[in-house]
């Protein structure tokens, strides 16, 4: 399938600089650039399929991009197309971790029970607000005493502590745990860091 590209897209596809940022409006063809760059790296730069990873923010978008790549270039094999969390999950499995992800319904249930002690009406929006606060705090890697939640500090701390205690007891992970653990491994284990530097030669993020 022939794809019509303008000069800007061709330049982005064939550019040889180590790090490249493509800034363009929605619908302008950034995804088209990415799948064409993957093909260019393989066909022209002789990269191996396993040298390339393509990251996007949802599983649906990753699957769509993978299918577009295969259909456009008539490929049966493709590089890794996935989400950040999907990549982190694979890395941790490769390093010997056993991972069971907590179900979203259970997350909501834990928070609902706690909030019900403080509020007569606990709706899904309030539960999501608490879970978003927990996620923001965890990924900030900061001290809980310095974190400013959008709910009361007392309620937030209780929600956070009971949520983490439940996960620890049941040996469960959430998606933030994946990214935090991978970051820790890469920062504190030079063998692992250098191993993935050698493994992932081309990283494309949509």
Which positions does each model-derived feature cover?
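Conserved pre-motif I regulatory segment
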Residues: 1-23, 159, 176-182
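A basic/glycine-biased coupling hinge at the interface between accessory DNA-binding modules
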Residues: 41-200
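Short secondary-structure boundary/capping elements
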Residues: 4, 30-33, 184-188
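Hydrophobic residues in beta-strands of the RecA-like P-loop NTPase core, especially within AAA+ ATPase
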Residues: 204-205
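Walker A/P-loop
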Residues: 17-37
């Amino acid at each position: 399938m022939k794809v019509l590209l303008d000069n800007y897209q061709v330049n982005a596809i064939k550019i040889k600089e180590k790090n490249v940022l493509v800034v363009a409006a929605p619908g302008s063809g950034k995804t088209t650039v990415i799948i064409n760059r993957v093909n260019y790296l393989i066909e022209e730069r002789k990269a191996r399929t396993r040298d390339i990873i393509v990251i996007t923010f949802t599983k649906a978008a990753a699957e769509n991009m993978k299918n577009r790549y295969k259909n456009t270039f008539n490929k049966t094999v493709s590089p890794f197309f996935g989400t950040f969390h999907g990549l982190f999950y694979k890395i941790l499995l490769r390093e010997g971790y056993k991972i069971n992800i907590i179900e979203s319904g259970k997350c909501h249930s834990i928070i609902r029970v706690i909030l019900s002690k403080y509020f007569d009406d606990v709706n899904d929006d309030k539960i999501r607000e608490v879970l978003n606060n927990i996620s923001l705090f965890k990924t900030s890697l900061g001290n809980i005493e310095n974190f400013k939640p959008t709910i009361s500090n007392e309620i937030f701390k209780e929600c956070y502590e009971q949520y983490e205690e439940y996960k620890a007891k049941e040996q469960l992970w959430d998606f933030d745990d994946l990214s935090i653990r991978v970051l820790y491994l890469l920062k504190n284990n030079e063998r692992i860091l250098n191993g993935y530097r050698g493994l992932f030669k081309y990283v494309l993020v949509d």
